[in-house]
Amino acid sequence: QDYLPEDVIARQNVIDAIRRVYERYGFVPIDTPVLEHFETLTGAAGNEVNKEIFTLETPEGEPAAMRFDLTVPFARIVSQYREEIKLPFRRYHIGPVFRADKPGPGRFRQFTQCDIDIAGARSLAADAEVIAVLCEAMRAVGTAEDGVPLFRIRISNRLLVDALLGGNGITETERMKHTLRVIDKLQKVGIDNVKQELGNGRIDDSGDPIPGVYLPETVISAIAEFIGVCGASRMETVTQLQTKLPVSDSTAAALSDMQELAALLDALGISEAEAIFDPSLTRGLDYYTGPVFEIEVVGMPSIGSI
């Protein structure tokens, strides 16, 4: 992507507005090299993301790679500078990332991420605060019209899906990962194609075969009911999910987390229009273990998640 002066100015104005919000909430900046040791980036990403990493070799023959996000470099920073960093560490990082992905609408091989994280905070209050900061950042860049938000934050919890799969006998790691990747395609390919991929697989529009997970029909139906839950409010969604999950300690813990998060978002003044609970959001990255959220622009699906 090339940016001419008018686009550069507009883009910088957006980044500056986001940065001001981050700093107002007490987040401090860091920066890391675009190039990382290959093993640093591949250790936490998972096989699907590993396929999207731009790799190269240093003049000394050492494998290196271009960062595909800003979270893995942040994990390295926290580990490497543990004696110098005081926890909880509230950092923001704005910079380009690179993915050897197939370009398409809303998908680029280089794009800018505006990351915030709170390292060393175990409370769900930290997740709720990050969501609140993201809402304010989106408002600051003008994604609202007559008080109506033009963005939506979709929120789920990996523990919910883990409880669903574990309660239905799906415990083998690679099979769970495959299932999560298929579920995460829901908005892109629709429920019928998702159900086919959870079963014996399907043929895509280009005629290429897509392998299936080969789950039993009863499990596919349970997953379809689970990801189809959509309550009128965050708390109502949690209530409906209770009827779609097997009874277990892990289910109780996951639902308790979602109830607490719903209450925190209400207390922070986050409207139901700005943030919804969506159990179909799973993401494919292996390092997600609890709450998961992403932002989308309302009415513009071609942009993808932001």
Predicted regions and their residues:
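Positively charged, Gly/Ser-enriched RNA/tRNA-binding surfaces
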Residues: I9-Y25, E36-E39, E60-G61, T71-E84, ...
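Extended hydrophobic secondary-structure segments that form protein cores and membrane-embedded regions
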Residues: H93, I153-R154
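Short acidic/polar active-site loop segments enriched in Thr and Asp
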Residues: V28, F151
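Acidic, His- and aromatic-enriched active-site or binding-groove loops in soluble protein domains
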Residues: K51-P59, G169-I203, V297-M300
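Auxiliary tRNA-acceptor-end handling modules of aminoacyl-tRNA synthetases
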Residues: D2-V8
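Polyanion/phosphate-binding surface patch
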Residues: I30-A64, R107
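Short, highly charged C-terminal tails/helix-capping segments
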Residues: R154-L164
